[in-house]
Amino acid sequence: MIDLEFYKGKKVFITGHTGFKGSWLCEVLLMAEADVTGYALEAPTEPALFNILSLKDRMKSNIGDIRNLEYMKKCMDEAQPEIVIHMAAQPLVRESYKNPVYTYDVNVMGTVNVLECVRMTESVKSVINVTTDKVYKNKEWEWGYRENEELNGFDPYSNSKSCSELVTDSYKNSFFLERDIAVSTMRAGNVIGGGDFAADRIIPDCVRAAIKGEDIIIRNPHSVRPYQHVLEPVMAYLLVAQEQYKNHELAGNYNVGPNEENCLSTGDIASLFCAKWNEKSGNNIKWVNKWDGGPHEANYLKLDCSKIKQVFQWKPLISANKMLELTIEWYWKWINDFEKCSKEAKSQIVSNYL
């Protein structure tokens, strides 16, 4: 499993560090005493976990667009990182239908720019490109997709991430093999956890409704997703980055998702949230099924994570039940005892992984 001692003093460059998942990643690395540099747009939501954790004051934070090759090159050149983790993206399916050109520009050409900066930075030894479980051509079957399945996402977001995989493979074959740079893509499922305030995501929608005392609107309660706590993929990214740094032959493409018994429908997640929130608050919130006629989204999606388990002996540590408990505890602190939000994040990292 991951050895955070490995990261002590390591120079790590993260794109997308101001986002939800990026903020959790930065918190873990700072706890490990890594030398962390971030490159991203301003935090995408208000409130934002990045600001709640005061990350701007604890690391080198560059505010910039990954489509700006020259500025990102300048920032990476100054940082001289050994490890690069690329997370910056336009991450929402429904938003990609509204703004497909922007989505492709950020997710495809943005990836080209990140890899081009890596190509021009001699210090880099290990690279992780964070994509998504949605890179696969979805056949609506009950089996988990394996890393050798066809890449062909349906919607602009998913498809742009499929393209990002191909771009990474091309750069790897064309430039990085001869430089001995280890490059992996990692395909994680839907993540939940404290500090997510984005639109069109199950837990933020649940929290917003619960605070207002309103019913939670669920668009498609029967859709199955590989939901997992945000710390699961974050720790997996760090594990693979660490191990391929030591042994470049371990670089590849890896799924990251929950065990079979924790693959739940959106309705299951909403029901768990309501039960645990009501138990904590004494309220009686509920969810309702209300399809809003939105664009196509896959109904059934699972990942086969046998490869990462076999190669790295990785395994998910947080059950679905625990995932909801940790998530609600963080939001409860945010609502009722704001000063303890940062401490709660650190506590969840320590209690589950250290």
Segment roles from a protein language model:
Residues 12, 71, 102, 109, ...:
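Residue-level recognition of oxygen-bearing side chains
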